[in-house]
Amino acid sequence: KEFYDELNQETINLLWDDTNRLYTIKEQVAYPFKNEWVEYEAWLSSVSDNNINTNKSVNDFISVLFKDNNHPFNHRGQYYKITLDGEHEETYICYDKMNVLSQTSDFKVVRCNQTLRWVDKTNGDIIEMPCYIGYDLSSTNNQYAKDGAIPNARLIIYVQANEQTMNIEINQRFMFMHKQCYKVEQVEDYETDQFCDNPTMVKLYIAYSPLLAVDNAELNLCDYYS
């Protein structure tokens, strides 16, 4: 086993610079998650599998490969900072972590295309957390009604599990783009990660909610005046 592990690492070392997919990215220090970052070189490529479809932007999903096959295992919900165009640094969240049975240190991330903002009920502080919002297809088939075909899709949010997000409740509301509101219908915050006793990522199922008088569109906050 050690022989093949070394051979695999030597092959990667030999080919590492022979690509135009080489980037320097920042990995969040974990676990526990901290607002500290470590830079690593990585190969980046687009994810192409059955889960990426017309309801999702392919550009948002990235496969990451680190050079060191013994890179410390990461976690779902761990954040990464990536600058694809050389100018705009964006935050990504890991949704498919490294596999202990894999011969390489590779995993998948998705771009955080929104920010969760809400008011902490205990102290009134405004909390902000990068997140991904998109559609989770429950079936590959459409539902058919008299008005036409309806996709079996639900809006979901992926966000890191931490002290703040683990307190998100059903019926809690969030605003995006200073006008669009959604309420939480289901919270999945109980799945522990491999080699970690605590949940590392929260998955929220959300549904449309109208803008209410207690909301502050200017601050992009729901239930601000409640």
Spans of features found by a protein language model:
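Intrinsically disordered, low-complexity segments enriched in Gly and acidic/Ser/Thr residues
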Residues: T140-V187, F195-P199
